[in-house]
Amino acid sequence: CSTKQQFDETTVTDYLDYPLRVYPVGRLDKESQGLLLLTNEGDLVNKIMRAGNYHEKEYFVTVNKPVDREFVRRMSKGVPVLDTVTRPCRVVQTGECSFRIILTQGLNRQIRRMCRYLGYEVQKLKRIRIMNLTLDGIREGEYREITAQEWEELNHLLESSTSETVIRTGEQNGNSSDHANERAGAKAGQGSKGVLPAGYRDHKQQRVRSDVR
């Protein structure tokens, strides 16, 4: 989804009855679902999404055929996509045709492209974690406020992060959703449930939302 009205489609913010304009942290393509953090702080968006900060985003993925050790090994090591090679990442098989993957970068449609390169097609992709924020306790289509403890921990994790935009090889020409967000300062996202940090409603509005289709 997006915060822009494109092709007369409903945007994620249309579902929120909220007085301030908020933006999703990161993107999920239209076919994906899962956790989404909404905020009105562009600097927070940039710190979380900037690839150089190496912050984790975790996904649950189902593919069209059985996963084997070679698939897990090659996905973990890095796969050529978009004129670059993806960073080494953690991949754990969870079922015959499913796995969890933890990324620290956000190339355009990265997981789908990685799987396709290895001869697989993604059937379901769900983001289940952004840094310390998870979907735990949030049902399909719901959102909640970030707790004070989550907000404190998030800020601690971001202490040494920079919000500066740095374009790297293979992350130019719109290939990286991380940098698309950095250039926009909090541009767009797709997903479903949301959270706001308790006690920060006046100035720092954060929601964690998750789109489940």
Describe the role of every protein-language-model region.
Residues 1-168:
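Basic, flexible Lys/Arg- and Gly-enriched helix-loop patches that mediate nucleic-acid binding at interfaces
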